A protein has these predicted regions:
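Short acidic, glycine/Ser/Thr-rich loop/turn "cap" segments at secondary-structure junctions
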Residues: 80-86, 114-123, 136-144
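Alpha-helical scaffolds flanking conserved acidic
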Residues: 57-58, 109-121, 172-179
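Short amphipathic alpha-helical segments, especially helix-boundary/capping motifs
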Residues: 36, 74-79, 110-115, 132-135
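Alpha-helical phosphate/pyrophosphate-handling elements in metalloenzyme active cores
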Residues: 82-114
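Active-site flanking loop/helix segments enriched in acidic
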Residues: 44-51, 55-65, 69-92
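Sequence-structural signature of the catalytic-core scaffold of metal-dependent phosphohydrolases
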Residues: 2-48, 65-70, 95, 99, ...
Length: 184
């Protein structure tokens, strides 16, 4: 196995920074630039300092590795009391949202990695049975004098505090904000 020397590592880092600046110049003035990405905490491990992925690409990977994301697989998007091939799974819904969001973002020259990360993570905190479950939880919470269950806030909670055995993932503030505000 060939070990990279410092000059090679520096060249790759400089090239990544150059590509980031070039990409940022292609974005709309209203878009969040990759170079403006802010992480909640400083990275814990040294190997991430040499990561050639852009910050929002890192967020995509972290969301894809979330156990909450992996649980999308067998969840239906809507509650149904009968079997139907026409009731989509949550994983398909999330893929459709991601695809449509990226298409819109591309047309507006927005940051596609930020959009994809937000779209993939937008439903991580849904209650069982989707919006029906969320309404049922809210009724019970109101009866007991508590606040509301908001799946968008629960999505952020899952990412920051529940994933990785309570360590959470270090996802950018911009992605967390997009997930938190995705439903208005």
């Amino acid at each position: 196995m060939k070990v990279m020397n410092m000059k090679e590592e520096e060249r790759i880092i400089k090239n990544t920074i150059k590509r980031t600046k070039e990409y940022d110049r292609t974005l709309s003035p209203y878009a969040c630039k990759t170079s403006e990405c802010q992480k909640l905490r400083k990275e814990e491990s040294e190997h991430e300092e040499f990561d050639i992925r852009w910050p929002f690409e890192e967020d995509i990977g972290r969301i894809l590795y979330c156990k909450s994301y992996q649980r999308y697989t067998d969840k239906t998007q809507a509650l149904s009391f009968f079997q139907s091939a026409h009731i989509s799974k949550r994983s398909i819904h999330v893929q459709w949202v991601s695809r449509i969001a990226r298409q819109i973002g591309k047309g507006l020259n927005l940051n596609l990695d930020l959009i994809e990360a937000a779209a993939l993570g937008h439903d991580l905190g849904h209650a069982p049975y989707g919006h029906v479950g969320e309404r049922a939880l809210n009724e019970k919470l109101q009866e007991k004098g508590f606040g509301y269950f908001c799946h968008n806030a629960n999505s952020v909670r899952n990412i920051l505090y529940l994933e990785r055995n309570g360590k959470g993932y270090n996802v950018s503030l911009q992605v967390l904000d997009a997930i938190l505000c995705h439903n208005g």
